[in-house]
Amino acid sequence: MANTKFRPLHDRVVVRRVESENKTAGGIIIPDTAQEKPQEGEVIAVGNGVLNDNGQRVSLEVKEGDRILFGKWSGTEVKINGEELLIMKESDIMGILA
């Protein structure tokens, strides 16, 4: 994403999904058509925050490089420079993985 000229606005973040395993614990390979999309990702770009009631900018808690969990239906899928990414609001993020 470093060579991309895209920067999300306000409280939005750009997320790259983390690929899930395509094999079960028993060794059965799951085809792409039967796999669920992962709900884990890496934040690759963040907006500059939102304005509070006093007009002060409140920055986001997540930052580039954070590994996050998000809801199954969170975000909007977009393609930027040929890469499938998600754009979502920070409130759609459930937590940061340590």
Curated annotation (Swiss-Prot):
InterPro entries according to UniProt: Chaperonin_GroES, Chaperonin_GroES_sf, Chaprnonin_Cpn10_CS, GroES-like_sf
Location(s) in or outside the cell: Cytoplasm
GO cellular component terms attached to this protein's record: cytoplasm
Stored PROSITE patterns: CHAPERONINS_CPN10
GO molecular function: ATP binding; metal ion binding; protein folding chaperone; protein-folding chaperone binding; unfolded protein binding
Keyword annotations of the record: Chaperone, Cytoplasm
Top-rank taxon: Bacteria
Gene3D superfamilies linked to this entry: GroES chaperonin
Presence of the UniProt keyword Chaperone in the record: yes
GO aspect biological process, one term: chaperone cofactor-dependent protein refolding
Pfam families in alphabetical order: Cpn10
Record's function text: Together with the chaperonin GroEL, plays an essential role in assisting protein folding. The GroEL-GroES system forms a nano-cage that allows encapsulation of the non-native substrate proteins and provides a physical environment optimized to promote and accelerate protein folding. GroES binds to the apical surface of the GroEL ring, thereby capping the opening of the GroEL channel.
Quaternary data: Heptamer of 7 subunits arranged in a ring. Interacts with the chaperonin GroEL.
Family according to the record: Belongs to the GroES chaperonin family.
Protein name: Co-chaperonin GroES
Chain's gene name: groES
